[in-house]
Amino acid sequence: MELSRIPEGLVCSSGRPYHAKACFKATLHGFCPPFVLQQALKELLTPVLYDQFYCETPLSQKKAHVHRCRNRCVTFYWHCHCSSANSLQCAAAKKVANSVFYHSFIVMQNDNKMCPVPVCCDTWACIPFKPLGIVKQRRCTCYFFVMGGKFETEVLHVASEYSVKFLPFKPNVEIVCVICSCVDSPESCLKRVRRMMNCLRMVMCCSFVNADALQR
């Protein structure tokens, strides 16, 4: 889907001049911020092509859609910033991008598949770590979580068998992306990640943190 201009009322994340805009729609669930899919799309495009032709944060979206807290379809507007608008190189890059977008079934699945086990007080103040959803790609599955506080060390230790990325979201809050490249069945993969998540929740709960502080 080509756009001649960006619709009014959108929040553009880049103030740079742009051209050759293309749309990509993704389904997001609950409180999951739209930008969590950015890294997945960048890997599909390859960083070389992505960094040369597209925004670092290629999201333009109506504020009302960004801040909705229930299932919604979010539209990404990819702005090409190359120096030769409508050149063969630009057209080729756009064609590759569109092919990647439309043949990649990137859907943020509902977070209720994660089934966190109640631990301690089971509140955000007690356990600042909650699942957001799952994105399945061709070669891996990405599990997204929202995390408060400074628990990067704990996450890296408990999730050492996975590739983990931290995406800043707001002050003292991060989006954690746990990437699994196993060849097991989706059910087995989800079961292991769920076990890892519940272990992390136990390590982060107020009872464990306070007991650890007293021992020190």
Swiss-Prot record:
Ranked from the top, the taxonomy reads: Viruses, Varidnaviria, Bamfordvirae, Preplasmiviricota, Tectiliviricetes
The organism named in the record is Snake adenovirus serotype 1
Which superkingdom heads the taxonomic lineage of this protein's source? Viruses
This chain belongs to the protein called: Protein E4.2
